[in-house]
Amino acid sequence: MDLQRGFVFLSLVLSFMIIETTAYRERQLLLLQPPQETAIDTANAVVTVQDRGLKTRRPEHKNAYATMMYMGTPRDYEFYVATRVLIRSLRSLHVEADLVVIASLDVPLRWVQTLEEEDGAKVVRVENVDNPYRRQTNFNSRFKLTLNKLYAWALSDYDRVVMLDADNLFLKKADELFQCGRFCAVFINPCIFHTGLFVLQPSVEVFKDMLHELQVGRKNPDGADQGFLVSYFSDLLDQPLFSPPSNGSVLNGHLRLPLGYQMDASYFYLKLRWNIPCGPNSVITFPGAVWLKPWYWWSWPVLPLGFSWHEQRRATIGYSAEMPLVIIQAMFYLGIIVVTRLARPNITKLCYRRSDRNLTTIQAGFKLIALLSVVAAYIFPFFTIPHTIHPLIGWSLYLMASFALSSISINTLLLPTLPVLTPWLGILGTLLVMAFPWYPDGVVRALSVFAYAFCCAPFVWVSFRKITSHLQVLIEKEVLFPRLGDSGVTSGFSKLY
């Protein structure tokens, strides 16, 4: 197969994957188009809430678990999936409370309908709260709309509300939280409480006062809900620890919640087990880097608890939205493997004139393309695999995709098989080392991964050297670059002038 056909083959492969990935993302973006009927005046919407509170449709219980959704980030779909899993997991625990989603007006109606009709949530639509801290020098734009969480105080249909972030993982029922006082939260940080879960007593007056504090510029270190609420409830650290009364009575005032209601996942990674004696071990939270949230398939086995979240998803909403694309990609990659093994396309006999002064540049460029094709084989699949698929499926598809794309480089560019696949074997080994379930603690696990990576590094370097030296040998022997007029050159091959 000549140069032209080889590049056509590579172009078809990459074009198909780009089209499929773009089509999948466009299907998600179609869901993100804001409904036209929600274009209402912001000031009027907030005034209405201040006057009447947020009313849910046919409240069934006196208490509620609530979470929020808003648009405008690159990860809107992922957080929508996380919200669905949270709602479904609470339903599966048979909590005695309504499940409320505080959704901004630009959340797609299709998502709202799914939350209401399939997941059993009560969705209330709100206008985004304007964030006056967005011009702070340390402000992170992903926190721009987190002040929508303040709407929880306007849920006047309920006596108590447990406000939740979407990245909470419930291990068991926690309805005793509704016995807590007017405001209760967990101190993950010794001095700063965490707003991923807190209990509140709805009050329109408190909601009005919070909006007033926003207008006058109350101090807010991070410009998000966390900094504002820590400033607003600055005395919480001095309050007693919550212990639910055995008679079911409801407490008053402000209280600190035991750590078991907001167990930071990083504590688990130290011991690889939970051992928090103060309070029930009920809820896991995943603060930290957004790209390592548990719903991303690559978060496991890097972070072991990601698998627990995906098992909860598998038992609730499943993966039907992502599976069609996964099947298409798997069949496509399998086809690439078969075709490259049977047809063995290769770019050979790239001809040049004996007097060409740019030969060195051409050869260097060709070596660079060959090396980039190997690197791309391991990077490109990360952008095509659906982000929220189960880790076992995600990593299996990644290994298949990287193997298939590597086989194109091996057969098309005449590269040595083992050196090209050395990173593939290294990645597989890393996954097995990280997923090993019998480590005594997280320190031993981390040291094992480090030792494995240390041992693998020389093999990767040797493989890189072998690939570059092999390319140089091919060029020197004129396997890839025979001169015009040599007997091995036929008129059907491409020529460089």
Curated annotation (Swiss-Prot):
Belongs to the glycosyltransferase 8 family. Glycogenin subfamily. The record marks 149 as: Important for catalytic activity. The keyword Transmembrane applies. It comes from the Eukaryota. Mn(2+) binds at residues 165, 167. It is a multi-pass membrane protein. InterPro entries: GNT1/Glycosyltrans_8 (IPR050587), Nucleotide-diphossugar_trans (IPR029044). GO terms for molecular function: glycosyltransferase activity; metal ion binding. This is Putative glucuronosyltransferase PGSIP8. It is found in: Membrane. The keyword Metal-binding applies. Its EC number is 2.4.1.-. Its cofactor is Mn(2+). GO terms for cellular component: membrane. Signal peptide: none annotated. Keywords: Glycosyltransferase, Manganese, Membrane, Metal-binding, Transferase, Transmembrane, Transmembrane helix. It is an enzyme of class 2 (transferase). The chain crosses the membrane at residues 3-23, 319-339, 365-385, 388-408, 418-438, 442-462. The gene is PGSIP8.
